[in-house]
Design a protein with these regions (language model features):
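Iron-sulfur cluster-binding cysteine motifs and their immediate structural context
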Residues: 144-145, 154-172, 178, 182-200, ...
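A short, structure-level motif marking secondary-structure boundaries and short turns
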Residues: 39-41, 140-141, 168
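Charged, low-complexity surface patches
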Residues: 47-48, 148, 176
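FMN-binding flavodoxin-like domain, especially the glycine-rich phosphate-binding loop
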Residues: 1-132, 202, 208-210, 214-249
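A mid-sequence, solvent-exposed acidic-amphipathic segment
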Residues: 123-160
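Functionally constrained cores in energy, signaling, and assembly domains
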Residues: 10, 33, 70-71, 142-144, ...
């Protein structure tokens, strides 16, 4: 199967392993010209992770090198913990301006080193995530579907982890959630709420005292949600089909 590497990279993110892994599997199977001009752009919120470095390692195994790398800070949308930050009306204009410059760099085939995660930041991220990782397996236990759900199936179509199945017109989660927030951000009815039950996690063997973040993980209908206004649910669904097609090979 042939596609363009640009199509895959548009959805590669560093902090959400499912999208990274799905992209990785697809890229590993791509046939790429050894002379290709390969670019990557990370779009972090507060801290730039290791998305570009992950891609670099994948391509290195294919004897390929990234020609151009850059980063653009955007809106953090992990709405289970905090509202969209910085406010879109403040950050998006700056983001668009920088993206326009990056687009011109790419058109001109400029060379630029990829952004790399700071050692101190990486150590902090690794320490934090190591505590949260055991919870990730049960993270979707916190999702609650309200009566506002109309059974449209948008959540299923945009979930890159194939974690949602529509049964009797209601979404059912299958314990493979990677917390990308696509389902809650694109739900037209805001019918997906969230609150983890600590007692339920304890029954699963999770020491909730070590994972303090779960105490503040909460989402209600009134909670603010955010997704890129230029990316539709249909486009995400299309990307998901690309990932799935590679997994079937």
């Amino acid at each position: 199967m042939k596609t363009t590497i640009e199509a895959i990279l548009t959805t590669m993110v560093g902090g959400r392993p499912v999208t990274r892994d799905a992209s990785a599997r697809a890229i590993e199977k791509l046939k790429i010209n050894s002379k290709a001009y390969i670019f990557c752009v990370a779009m972090p919120s507060f801290v730039c992770g290791c998305a570009c470095e992950c891609l670099e390692n994948i391509l290195k195994n294919k004897n390929l090198k990234i020609s151009y790398g850059n980063k653009v800070y955007s809106v953090a949308n992990y709405c289970l913990v905090y509202p969209p930050l910085p406010p879109a009306k403040l950050i998006v204009p700056r983001t668009e301006k920088k993206l326009n410059k990056i687009a011109h760099d790419i058109i001109e085939r400029k060379k630029r080193e990829i952004p790399r995660v700071n050692f101190i930041v990486k150590k902090k991220i690794d320490k934090t995530m190591s505590k949260y990782k055991p919870v990730l397996k049960y993270a979707d236990l916190g999702f609650k579907i309200t009566d506002d759900c109309i059974g449209c199936g948008t959540c299923d179509r945009v979930c890159p982890a194939n974690n949602i199945e529509i049964i009797k017109n209601k979404p059912v989660f299958k314990n493979k959630c990677e917390q990308c927030m696509a389902c809650v951000s694109y739900c037209p009815q805001k019918a997906i709420e969230y609150k983890l039950d600590e007692n339920e996690l304890k029954e699963k063997g999770i020491d909730t005292k070590k994972v303090k973040i779960i105490k503040i993980m909460k989402l209600t209908k009134k909670s603010k949600r955010y997704h890129n206004p230029y990316i539709t649910s249909s486009e995400l669904a299309k990307k998901k089909k690309i990932y799935n097609s590679y997994d079937k090979q």
